[in-house]
Curated annotation (Swiss-Prot):
Role: Modifies, by uridylylation and deuridylylation, the PII regulatory proteins (GlnB and homologs), in response to the nitrogen status of the cell that GlnD senses through the glutamine level. Under low glutamine levels, catalyzes the conversion of the PII proteins and UTP to PII-UMP and PPi, while under higher glutamine levels, GlnD hydrolyzes PII-UMP to PII and UMP (deuridylylation). Thus, controls uridylylation state and activity of the PII proteins, and plays an important role in the regulation of nitrogen assimilation and metabolism.
Keywords attached to this entry: Hydrolase, Magnesium, Multifunctional enzyme, Nucleotidyltransferase, Repeat, Transferase
Gene expressing this chain: glnD
Entry similarity comment: Belongs to the GlnD family.
Domain called HD: residue spans: 450-572
InterPro entries, per database record: ACT-like_dom_sf, ACT_dom, HD/PDEase_dom, HD_domain, NT_sf, PII_UdlTrfase/GS_AdlTrfase, Polymerase_NTP_transf_dom, UTase/UR
Name this protein carries in UniProt: Bifunctional uridylyltransferase/uridylyl-removing enzyme
Pfam families registered for this protein in UniProt: GlnD_UR_UTase, HD, NTP_transf_2
Region (Uridylyl-removing): 333-691
Domain topic, free-text comment: Has four distinct domains: an N-terminal nucleotidyltransferase (NT) domain responsible for UTase activity, a central HD domain that encodes UR activity, and two C-terminal ACT domains that seem to have a role in glutamine sensing.
Species: Pseudoalteromonas translucida (strain TAC 125)
Gene Ontology terms: biological process: regulation of nitrogen utilization
Length: 872
């Protein structure tokens, strides 16, 4: 489109730096204002034209326009004439020979002026020989030259370069193709193979702009096609596919343009911070999450279409471009399908007139591990059939039978399920799946859309049957080998989050959907109830393990009562492990593995005893004491030494800790020279999966605040904390701490933390400093702390429950409020679930009494003020 006359005049008249800046400012205001009025393609072309005119003007200003041996060439996106508001400007200065000092100085002044105008530029000065040599070594540079465009100067040299680019054998067509495919593969792998993470990169993610550009680059190199449309005449694209790709390209451009406006800079990642403003700019509204959901759902669906078309076209290109040293093996699978190499092909599009044959294709994939891909013509046929479907595939009895065969197949939920997900067959079968496709999740846990999270969960369950699963998840692997109906576990996984985004309790709504599915597919009443129960309770085990004291027999009894049977416990445990691992790449760690395993084993034991014969607290204490004492006696400790230490502990100590921990604590205390003095021990052996820190000290109100501050200052994360008091006025702290990456603390670091804690105990007045380093992700969720004060079973105690974003220093802030209000902490339970802290404190006031209503109100207000200030 033509630039406004005023922009042209301002640029023509510009003399001083301030004039150029005024011209640029006017242009960008015009550009941003036009976004809601014009097709985005016009605007990105307009910016390229504006930069063309600016460079040509400055070429004249710095007396470069009269140099006969110089050509100014746009490359990359700028060469295509596509510049988003803040995109980099890449150009090549092509010279016939190395420029002399005078010309080099002029070039330097030219480039400096562009920097002074705050333009992000990428430039190089090359002879044709140098450009060809760099092209030989660097496929990225070769690709950028493929899109080169002469802006000004020596057109003869430019044409020589263009001819070399196309005809030179340096990057033969097949070599270029293989290099671009490998480049795309590595790019996708960096994104974990999915476009559906919640902060997608519009350019680099699978299905992003790069995938579209890869198609164009290969077409230019091999077919000398300048546009996608030319692929129609070459027989690679249908008119409908060209229209679809064009529509996808325009949509991605729109979102990227809006992202630049929202960020105020060049940005390709659609970060949470930018999503609300980008959604508003794009016309999705300004109603927060709803607007963002609509925008992101459209984006994810566009990226899915691009990825599928990219996959299909590159497969077609490979057939034409890559030399065949030998014919691929062709194996007939049945009368409708054949295997060609590692691809499955439908023999005739008419096969899919019988809808159940769509699932037969995936059943063959499950049957044949050699098949890793779908033949490109078959992808095209699937796409066409998918578009013409009337109703859901589950409405056809033959499809239901085929679907059930697939989920019961030993390999059906592996690659076959992944390809079904990738090619839209789950959405074609289950209407509820269409609703979660591209569905955002606004919480502090999930890194992926609902459908992608569910896909990963299913992959995790499938892994239990694999050799890697046996070593990494031995209990789950052992369970599934004796599981009578693993398909029920898979179905619970498919439905566990299927009601997200509808409002209401997604677990209960999903259970209703699961029951309806079971009825439609003729499952027995018992099987349908099990699937629905798993969906309804899929968070139960995770919540219990991470928020409650799993060493408390009462907690185990309550959990076992809800689980009811060992069979349901087995299914729930396998589902929970797979669910947490599929949530994001950082949530699962050895500590959570240990918690869930212990809860599973405790509950299994309780169920085997019988719910009518639960182990009571006295039995548990007696058993733990016996086992811990036996350990200590075997190590050479005397019984009277052990009894003397234990006589100081209340009963809750023996329920709170395992026999291994009790033994570890006791060894330390028996060996202590002076039990009137505080002490610290640290170990990675006391509990698998985390570093244990045990602190023994005379009771002091501010002590908790100091200890958690020290741990925070050492950049360790507190996963779990317990505070217990002895009968004689001492306090016991037990922390489980991890590195930021979820690993236990290394030995050297652990000793450093131990020394710092000892210093805090012996030098209580020394200030503790630590740097606040608030994660970007915390800023992206407007989640206010939840603070609840309630009575405690003991009349002289109160319970404080706090849920908040786990910001650095959170526990310190809480402890500071407690200290300011002279509260005594008698017990605490600190848990971290994802990036949310859930903390429980048993406290009393300065008179060791329960908090009065007035005290509760003051503490509630103080906590809210302190924590809101930290999360804003």
């Amino acid at each position: 489109m033509a630039l406004p006359n005023k922009v042209k005049k301002l640029l023509s008249d510009a003399e001083q730096l301030s004039d150029y800046r005024d011209c640029s400012s006017y242009f960008y205001k015009w550009l941003f204002n036009e976004f809601s009025k014009q097709p985005v393609g016009n605007l990105i072309n307009a910016r390229a034209e504006f930069i063309d005119r600016l460079l040509i003007k400055l070429f004249h200003v710095y007396d470069l326009a009269h140099e006969p041996d110089l050509a100014l060439i746009a490359v990359g996106g700028y060469g295509r004439g596509e510049l988003h508001p803040y995109s980099d400007i890449d150009f090549l200065l092509l010279v016939t020979q190395q420029p002399n000092a005078e010309i080099s100085e002029k070039i330097g002044q030219f480039v400096t002026m562009l920097w002074d105008l705050n333009l992000e530029i990428g430039h190089s000065v090359r002879t044709i020989a140098q450009a060809i040599e760099q092209k030989r070594e660097d496929v990225t540079f070769a690709t950028s030259l493929l899109e080169s465009r002469l802006i000004f100067g020596n057109h003869i040299e430019f044409e020589k370069l263009k001819n070399h680019i196309i005809d030179t054998p340096v990057w033969r067509s097949n070599e270029f193709f293989l290099a671009k495919v490998q480049e795309q593969h590595l790019r996708h792998r960096k994104c974990h193979g999915t476009a559906y993470n919640l902060e997608p990169n519009i350019k680099e993610n699978p299905g992003g702009l790069r995938d579209l550009q890869t198609i164009i680059w290969v077409a230019k190199k091999h077919f000398r096609a300048e546009t996608l449309q030319e692929l129609i005449s070459h027989g690679y694209l249908t008119h409908e596919e060209f229209q679809e790709l064009s529509e996808c390209l325009e949509n991605l451009w729109n979102i990227r343009f809006a992202l630049h406006l929202a960020a105020g800079r060049s940005e390709n990642r659609l970060l949470f911070d930018h999503q609300p403003q980008a959604a508003e700019i794009l016309g999705f509204g300004s109603d927060g999450k709803s607007s963002v959901e609509r925008m992101m759902k459209r984006l994810f669906r566009i990226m899915s279409r691009v990825r599928e078309l990219n996959l299909m076209l590159l497969a077609y290109f490979e057939q034409s471009i890559s030399p065949k040293h030998h014919q691929p093996i062709i194996q007939e699978l049945d009368r409708n399908f054949e295997r060609i190499g590692n691809q499955i092909k439908v023999k005739s599009p008419s096969v899919f007139f019988r809808r159940d044959q769509l699932f037969m294709l995936f059943e063959h994939i499950a049957d044949n591990p050699e098949i890793t891909h779908i033949y490109p013509s078959t992808i095209r046929t699937i796409r066409q059939v998918r578009r013409r479907l009337l109703g859901d595939l589950q409405d056809y009895a033959a499809c239901r039978e085929a679907f059930l065969r697939l989920i019961k197949h030993p390999n059906g939920m592996g690659r076959a399920f992944t390809l079904m997900h990738k090619h839209g067959m789950l959405a074609a079968y289950l209407p509820q799946w269409r609703n979660i496709f591209g569905q955002m999740q606004f919480d502090l846990f999930h890194a992926y859309t609902v459908d992608e999270h569910t896909h990963r969960l299913i992959n995790n369950i499938y892994q239990y049957f694999d050799k890697t699963g046996v070593s990494e998840f031995p209990i789950c692997s052992e369970i599934v080998t004796r599981m009578d109906k693993p398909e029920l576990l898979y179905l619970a996984g498919i439905f566990h989050d299927i009601a997200k985004g509808r409002g209401g309790d997604h677990s209960e709504l999903g259970a209703v959907d699961a029951l309806a599915f079971a009825k439609l597919h003729a499952f027995s009443v018992a099987d349908g109830k099990l699937i629905a129960w798993l969906v309804s309770n899929h968070l139960l085990m995770s919540v219990t393990a991470q928020r409650k004291d799993i060493n408390d027999p009462g907690v185990i009894k309550d959990f076992a009562t809800r689980v009811k049977t060992e069979r349901q416990l087995d299914y729930l445990y396998c589902l929970t492990v797979a669910d947490i691992r599929a949530t994001n790449d950082n949530l699962w760690n050895d500590w959570k593995n240990t918690l869930l395993r212990e809860l599973y084993l405790h509950t299994q034991h309780a169920l085997r005893l019988g719910l009518e014969n639960p182990m009571d607290q006295r039995d548990q204490i007696r058993d733990k004491k016996h086992q811990a004492k036996q350990r200590l006696l075997n190590l050479g400790y005397m019984e009277d030494q052990i009894d003397l230490i234990w006589s100081r502990f209340k009963a809750n100590y023996f329920t709170a800790f395992s026999e291994q921990q009790i033994s570890w604590h006791s060894q330390h205390l028996v060996n202590s020279e002076d039990l009137s003095q505080p002490s610290v021990i640290v170990s990675n052996k006391a509990m698998h999966g985390g570093t244990q820190v045990f602190v023994y000290s005379p009771y002091s109100g501010p002590l908790f605040a100091r200890l958690v501050s020290v741990i925070g200052s050492k950049k360790a994360q507190i996963q779990h904390a317990q505070v217990l008091t002895t009968k004689d006025g001492y306090v016991l702290f037990n922390f489980v701490i991890l590195e930021v990456n979820g690993e236990p603390i290394a030995s050297g670091r652990a000793q450093s933390i131990k020394r710092a804690l000892e210093q805090a105990l012996f030098e209580p007045r020394k200030k503790i400093r630590f740097k606040k380093n608030r994660s970007q992700r915390f800023k992206d969720f407007n989640i206010k702390p939840k603070i609840v004060l309630r009575p405690h079973p003991r009349k002289d105690r109160s319970l404080i429950e706090i849920q908040a974003i786990d910001i650095p220093g959170l526990l310190t802030k809480i402890a500071e409020v407690f200290q300011a209000h002279l509260l005594h902490i008698h017990a605490a339970r600190i848990t971290t679930v994802g990036q949310r802290a859930e903390d429980f404190f048993v406290v009393s006031n300065n008179e060791y009494q329960a908090l009065t209503d007035e005290e509760q109100a003051k503490i509630h207000q103080a906590l809210r003020k302190k924590l809101n200030a930290e999360t804003e």
